[in-house]
Amino acid sequence: MWSHLNRLLFWSIFSSVTCRKAVLDCEAMKTNEFPSPCLDSKTKVVMKGQNVSMFCSHKNKSLQITYSLFRRKTHLGTQDGKGEPAIFNLSITEAHESGPYKCKAQVTSCSKYSRDFSFTIVDPVTSPVLNIMVIQTETDRHITLHCLSVNGSLPINYTFFENHVAISPAISKYDREPAEFNLTKKNPGEEEEYRCEAKNRLPNYATYSHPVTMPSTGGDSCPFCLKLLLPGLLLLLVVIILILAFWVLPKYKTRKAMRNNVPRDRGDTAMEVGIYANILEKQAKEESVPEVGSRPCVSTAQDEAKHSQELQYATPVFQEVAPREQEACDSYKSGYVYSELNF
């Protein structure tokens, strides 16, 4: 019985000493050999759906440390390591997955937490649109470039390029408005290609606009004459239509009305075109008197104003009569026969 009591007393004393030693060792490790771990990532700016890697490391390379990763109070994983950081691979798909994250390093009964780490979720920029305005002079070309990306988290940095060479510094825009860049160049002999780049805080992610090619002027020629010719022709056509509608047509209608109001005189018609029909001519013998039946004829005549007129004609009847006595005259010649004309 005494031996059993001695064993219990021995184990109680041993356990007490061990616990005190562990507490003393943990306190010593906390102050000297076991500082707080460090949680980091290669990038702090991500977009939704991006895979990321988080590194939890400790300055003490000689201890076997157990690393645990937490997002708020949710445990995400545990790894053991000695001298090397623990790597946790994650996928950021929702806004609440941006953080904060913490890493816990534990050795036996001693544990410490890292500082909070959070990601910044950024929407990527879409391909920008490049617009060019040109003012052409005899010797110079004044060019204004506008670049705008309609989607993407602000701020957005724009850079302009000419033939794949940057010609402007990064222009930051904190509002959804286009970046503008002006330049003046001598009339070139070759074609020039322009484009712009848009990027925000998302690293290693940039989009470019479609290239816009400016044709060469070829000396004093105008590269935009063809583009301006079509609007000019359309404007000229509109002007002609307006002139016809408001000036020529009313004038034509007035002249036509005046012509219709002029009185028509059939007797004084300058030109008369008639179509005659049913004219019968009969000749009798030399001894008999020719006699032709009277038949009315109808003709149609048109005056200058194109108005049709209906005219009636009759066939004359010839009768032989006795010759009358004529006074003698040197110039008179006999042998003529006169007839009466009856209608």
UniProtKB/Swiss-Prot annotation:
Disulfide links within the chain: 56-103, 147-196
Topology term for the membrane: Single-pass type I membrane protein
Record key words, sorted: Cell membrane, Disulfide bond, Glycoprotein, Immunoglobulin domain, Membrane, Phosphoprotein, Repeat, Signal, Transmembrane, Transmembrane helix
Domain of life: Eukaryota
Signal peptide: 1-19
Organs and tissues of expression: Expressed in myeloid cells (dendritic cells, macrophages and neutrophils, weak expression on B-cells but not in T-cells or natural killer cells), peripheral blood basophils and mast cells (at protein level).
Record function comment: Immunoglobulin-like receptor which plays an inhibitory role in degranulation of mast cells. Negatively regulates IgE-mediated mast cell activation and suppresses the type I immediate hypersensitivity reaction.
Assembly and binders: Monomer. Interacts (tyrosine-phosphorylated) with PTPN6, PTPN11 and INPP5D.
Protein name: Allergin-1
